[in-house]
């Protein structure tokens, strides 16, 4: 199902009320990573070029429904002004008379930013009275916040009841690439799924299994699968309550003739600590007194091998304890291999995206998803409220 986009509307002289995802990391009031702001620029610049009056809105952090200047979008307005080369006026609120007055005085091509939507608890509650007030700021609702598309909030889904709703370029791109993976990925299709827990990734594994030719399972959750296969995992993370789930998953993979790659060797430590000394174990079995922390060289070679011929690759989640420097090599290497793959490559999920950005590889990836939880739920095959309201 395709979505309606900004290309389907005439914006000349219209007020475009644009939901962006400006939930950026801040340190002492300074933005430490402006990736999400840059991701919104194509949509903003297009709307401006079409003669729209652009009213931007977003949340930032978790102010819990109260005005808290620590979560003000002022730093975002400053950064937008720099990136766009024009003044982006910061408004003191997201609804109310002062906002209405400023918006009514806007000229075509002007850009303003509303204050943090989550200063009102009604935003997350999708309260109808709040939605109505918000809708008075625009003529057309543009949702470009894929990162919050899995939330049925006032500014992500509610507005579609009061204004014509379309997706921005970022939303369109996410829907196109993630949708292609779910609907008709080109074979061979390799899914690399990492992360610490089976419980948080089993829905993605099960959703992608029927479409995959090869599935690589890494990270902390791999040890539960290795335990099912009869290997010793030492003191590594084990989810006992997911043993049966992992077992039936591996059985189903065999029935579907999907090749599942689990770690063949490991980087281990005596304790799960950042300063632990890495030790290499050249076997699938992990010694009883050791904790699995990362994948080893043999596993990496195997992953590299399957990626050479892959036509479609999805990578979600780290292959080891990426946040500990000594145990981040597996994830870093996989980032390199995915970037070198000649097929369509899609990377989603916080740590895998961080790895790609850390090593400046994002330009070599077909699509780096901006949505953490939203990407995950999309890949699980769930209907996302923020996308559903945009469907043609």
UniProtKB/Swiss-Prot annotation:
According to the UniProt record, what class of enzyme is this? transferase
The molecular function terms of the Gene Ontology recorded here are:
ADP binding; ATP binding; phosphoglycerate kinase activity
List of residues binding substrate = 21-23, 36, 59-62, 118, 151
> Under which pathway is this protein filed?
Carbohydrate degradation; glycolysis; pyruvate from D-glyceraldehyde 3-phosphate: step 2/5
The keyword Transferase appears for this protein: yes
User: According to its UniProt record, which reaction does this protein catalyse?
Assistant: (2R)-3-phosphoglycerate + ATP = (2R)-3-phospho-glyceroyl phosphate + ADP
Name the PANTHER family on file. Answer: PHOSPHOGLYCERATE KINASE, PHOSPHOGLYCERATE KINASE 1, CHLOROPLASTIC-RELATED
Could you give the subunit structure recorded for this chain? Monomer.
- Family statement drawn from the similarity comment of this UniProt entry: Belongs to the phosphoglycerate kinase family.
* Name of protein: Phosphoglycerate kinase
The organism is Borrelia turicatae (strain 91E135)
């Amino acid at each position: 199902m395709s979505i309606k986009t900004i290309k389907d509307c005439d914006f000349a002289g219209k007020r475009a009320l644009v939901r962006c995802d400006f939930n950026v990391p801040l340190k002492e009031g300074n933005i430490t990573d402006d990736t999400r702001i840059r991701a919104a620029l194509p949509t903003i610049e297009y709307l401006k070029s079409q003669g729209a009056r652009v009213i931007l809105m977003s949340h930032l952090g978790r102010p819990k429904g109260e005005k808290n200047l620590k979560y003000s979008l002022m730093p975002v307005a400053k950064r937008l002004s720099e990136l766009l080369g024009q003044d982006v006026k910061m408004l003191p609120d997201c609804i109310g008379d002062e906002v209405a007055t400023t918006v009514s005085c806007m000229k075509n091509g002007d850009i303003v930013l509303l204050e943090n939507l989550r200063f009102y608890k009604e935003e997350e509650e999708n309260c109808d009275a709040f939605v109505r007030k918000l809708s008075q700021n625009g003529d057309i609702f543009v949702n470009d916040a894929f990162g919050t598309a899995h939330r049925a909030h006032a500014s992500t889904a509610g507005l579609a009841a009061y204004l014509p709703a379309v997706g921005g370029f970022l939303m369109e791109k996410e829907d196109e690439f993630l949708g292609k993976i779910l609907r008709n990925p080109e074979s061979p299709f390799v899914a690399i799924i990492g992360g610490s827990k089976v419980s948080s990734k089993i829905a993605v594994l099960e959703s992608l299994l029927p479409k995959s030719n090869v599935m690589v399972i890494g990270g902390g959750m791999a040890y539960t699968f290795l335990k099912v296969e009869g290997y010793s995992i030492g003191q590594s993370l084990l989810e006992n309550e997911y043993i049966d789930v992992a077992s039936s998953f591996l059985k189903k993979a065999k029935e579907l003739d999907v090749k599942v790659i689990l770690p063949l060797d490991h980087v281990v430590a005596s304790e799960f600590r950042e300063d632990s000394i890495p030790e290499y174990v050249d076997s699938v079995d992990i010694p009883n007194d050791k904790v699995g922390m990362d994948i080893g060289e043999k596993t990496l070679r195997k992953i590299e091998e399957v990626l050479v011929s892959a036509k479609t690759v999805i990578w979600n989640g780290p292959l080891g304890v990426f946040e500990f420097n000594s145990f981040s090599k597996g994830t870093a290497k996989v980032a390199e291999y995915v970037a070198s793959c000649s097929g369509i490559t899609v990377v989603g999920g916080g740590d895998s995206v961080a790895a790609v950005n850390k090593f400046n590889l994002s330009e070599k990836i077909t699509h780096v998803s901006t949505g953490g939880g939203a990407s995950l739920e999309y890949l699980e095959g769930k209907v996302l409220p923020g996308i559903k309201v945009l469907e043609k």
